[in-house]
Amino acid sequence: MDTVLLLVSLCISAAFCNNEEERLLNDLMKNYNKNLRPVEKDGDIISVSIKLTLTNLISLNEKEEALTTNVWVEMQWKDYRLSWDPNDYHGISMMRIPSTSVWLPDVGLENNVDGTFDIALYTNTLVSSDGSMYWLPPAIYRSSCPVVVTYFPFDWQNCSIVFQSQTYSANEIELLLTVDEQTIEWIEIDPEAFTENGEWAIKHMPAKRIINHRLPRDDVNYQQIVFYLIIQRKPLFYIINIIVPCVLISFVSILVYFLPAKAGGQKCTVSINILLAQTVFLFLVAQKIPETSTSVPLIVKYLTFLMVVTITIVANAVIVLNISLRTPNTHSMSSTVRELCLRTVPRLLRMHLRPTDAAPPLAPLMRRSSSLGLMMKADEYMLRKPRSQLMFEKQKERDGLMKVVLDKIGRGMENNTSDDLVHSLNHAAPEIRTCVEACCHIASATREKNDFKSENEEWILMGRVIDRVCFLVMCFVFFLGTIGTFLAGHFNQAPAHPFPGDSKLYQPST
């Protein structure tokens, strides 16, 4: 029985309270016009306090220069028409009234990029008995954010979210930052709902009330509430997916210097393939950054630098190939160039080159060439010689003629000089004069061939020396440019204070 009485009393109380809220709402809305500014006199100014709570930094589209954020916009003001005495309404001190039924300050996002000035959801408005209004609607804003791409992808950006009244001037409403024990001059972050962005790290979140004194007070642009988001990019994605592969591919282009000097075609093929790969990386970066001519991104500078290095390597390969294929018939090497490129520079670079004037290594080649030539000339001599002479060669030996000839040749060989040998052969017998002339021709041709080949090898060695010098220069330039690029990006950090010259941190005091 007691339980039944308790339930009945609770139901009656709830019904009574609902009736009181309904009566209060009817009394408040009676003769209420939501289109009129809630002022008692024409000269009164309504103070509207604004606070921004960030729940998610969704993205920053560099191409469109648009910042997308998920926020809660808190607005507070007073409406004297919506005040009551709680004692008259069973102690009710707060009411929830649909925001579409009351006057709202027409404060919207000024720097939007999609034409949406309004909030996303019209939530209820909390109304206190003294007429204080509290409205906390959620919104997803796409605000304009001019992107500075000078140090991309090691950059930081200063984006702003600007609020101002669309129709009311400063003589009608006054925009202020919310005051709660102290003026909240920053963007609040809800620790329970906030989701960290994977690409951007928030460094500073200051807020300011901007007054443009160059405009009159009755201008709607006279006052603004600006919330700043100073964010630093996390460059790991671009380092792993663009910079590191590009550096490795470009380093391969330097390794073409280890190919032989005469392999110029293979050098050019490898370098041009690497150049095409670098062009693809440059195209990928161009799709990410805005189309601006005010500045060149750091990564574009670096990719252009690598392309210049690769093109230089291709040009060097063509020049070295031209030098390596030179012959004494078309070019002659001066003594100064020979001394510089084949002696001085290799000695400084500690290159182990065969001395150009070393005769012993050529001796086996000369002997092989001479033997081969003599055999060919001997075969030709046997074909041209009459058969009657071949039939009586043994008879000449019996007559002692061959013995005399061999003695004279032997005396020339004992002197161990080619001139004495030729002189002995000339006086040996008239029959072998033709053979002597053939031998002289073979020896002269062999010397010319060896000299030709030796000078041809000098051009090849010169190409090797140029390759080594260019390899060292390109390595130095490559590493210097790479280190300089990364250092420039490393030192481009967001400032310690949000505004230059202002030591205030614009954050909650701890």
From Swiss-Prot:
Main location: membrane
Keyword set includes Nucleotide-binding: no
Stretches assigned to the Extracellular side: 18-234
Any GO BP annotation: acetylcholine receptor signaling pathway
GO molecular function: acetylcholine receptor activity; acetylcholine-gated monoatomic cation-selective channel activity; transmitter-gated monoatomic ion channel activity involved in regulation of postsynaptic membrane potential
Catalytic activity from the UniProt record: K(+)(in) = K(+)(out); Na(+)(in) = Na(+)(out)
Alphabetical keyword list: Cell membrane, Disulfide bond, Glycoprotein, Ion channel, Ion transport, Ligand-gated ion channel, Membrane, Phosphoprotein, Postsynaptic cell membrane, Receptor, Signal, Synapse, Transmembrane, Transmembrane helix, Transport
Stretches in topological domain Cytoplasmic: 324-468
Record membrane topology: Multi-pass membrane protein
Entry-linked InterPro entries: Neur_chan_lig-bd, Neur_chan_lig-bd_sf, Neur_channel, Neuro-gated_channel_TM_sf, Neuro_actylchol_rec, Neurotrans-gated_channel_TM, Neurotransmitter_ion_chnl_CS, Nicotinic_acetylcholine_rcpt
Disulfide bridge partners, by residue number: 145-159
Pfam families tied to this protein: Neur_chan_LBD (PF02931), Neur_chan_memb (PF02932)
Signal sequence range: 1-17
Annotated positions of the Phosphotyrosine modification: 381
Intracellular or extracellular location(s): Postsynaptic cell membrane; Cell membrane
Glycosylation sites: 158
Transmembrane segments: 235-259, 268-286, 302-323, 469-488
GO CC, any one term: neuron projection
Quaternary structure (record): Pentamer of two alpha chains, and one each of the beta, delta, and gamma (in immature muscle) or epsilon (in mature muscle) chains.
Function: After binding acetylcholine, the AChR responds by an extensive change in conformation that affects all subunits and leads to opening of an ion-conducting channel across the plasma membrane.
Family statement drawn from the similarity comment of this UniProt entry: Belongs to the ligand-gated ion channel (TC 1.A.9) family. Acetylcholine receptor (TC 1.A.9.1) subfamily. Gamma/CHRNG sub-subfamily.
Full protein name: Acetylcholine receptor subunit gamma
Gene this protein is translated from: chrng
